[in-house]
Amino acid sequence: MGEMTSGVDGHGSTKRTTSEAQKMDFNTDRGSAIPTGDDRGYQCGVIGDSVRFSVFTGYDAADVSIPKISSPGSAGFDLSVLEDREFIRGCHYRLPTGLAIAVPRGYVGIITPRSSQAKNFVSTGIIDSDFRGHIHIMVSAIADFSVKKNQRIAQLVVTPCLTQSEVVPYETLERTRRGTGGFGSSGQ
């Protein structure tokens, strides 16, 4: 990978050196979605640990969009596609992002469509805290549609995840008003 120059590209995005773009730490312990003073990324305020994104092996940092939080109240980091793509209703796709991620221990990353794309596809992805592979966006198209390179189509929400369990007799489970009702029993 070659060194990129600093400055602004033709799309209004700030270019970073390859080493800056390859590993960006999104510090999430200060509570607002603004650039940090050292331009390392965006602050989220969701958790006290950092969510770290890196350009995955074999991808050029210039081609990969590092995830961002769009506004101070955004719940997730926006994920982009690497190339123009056509989708056919009823088909399933696995889209590379060119990214790897380190989710803090005790948390899980959940990939979902951005609300603007919910009319086009359904998808859910789980990123475990110990996964260090290439992140993909799974798309099950519910309509014919197309996307452009670097278009933000999905989001990564990082949330706490309980992984400890205890097996107890059924009779000792706390009773609730809902009880055993499921599948629409709480109303439509």
From Swiss-Prot:
UniProt keyword annotation of Metal-binding present: yes
UniProt-annotated stretches for the region Disordered: 1-34
EC number: 3.6.1.23
Keywords in alphabetical order: Hydrolase, Magnesium, Metal-binding, Nucleotide metabolism
CDD domains, A to Z: trimeric_dUTPase (cd07557)
Keyword Hydrolase: yes
SUPFAM superfamilies: dUTPase-like
GO molecular function, one term: dUTP diphosphatase activity
GO biological process, one term: dUTP catabolic process
EC class: hydrolase
Cofactor annotation: Mg(2+)
Pfam families: dUTPase (PF00692)
Catalysis: reaction(s): dUTP + H2O = dUMP + diphosphate + H(+)
Gene3D superfamilies: 2.70.40.10
InterPro entries linked to this entry: dUTPase (IPR008181), dUTPase-like (IPR029054), dUTPase-like_sf (IPR036157), dUTPase_trimeric (IPR033704)
Family membership noted in the UniProt record: Belongs to the dUTPase family.
Stated role: This enzyme is involved in nucleotide metabolism: it produces dUMP, the immediate precursor of thymidine nucleotides and it decreases the intracellular concentration of dUTP so that uracil cannot be incorporated into DNA.
Annotated protein name in UniProt: Deoxyuridine 5'-triphosphate nucleotidohydrolase
Gene name of this polypeptide: 49
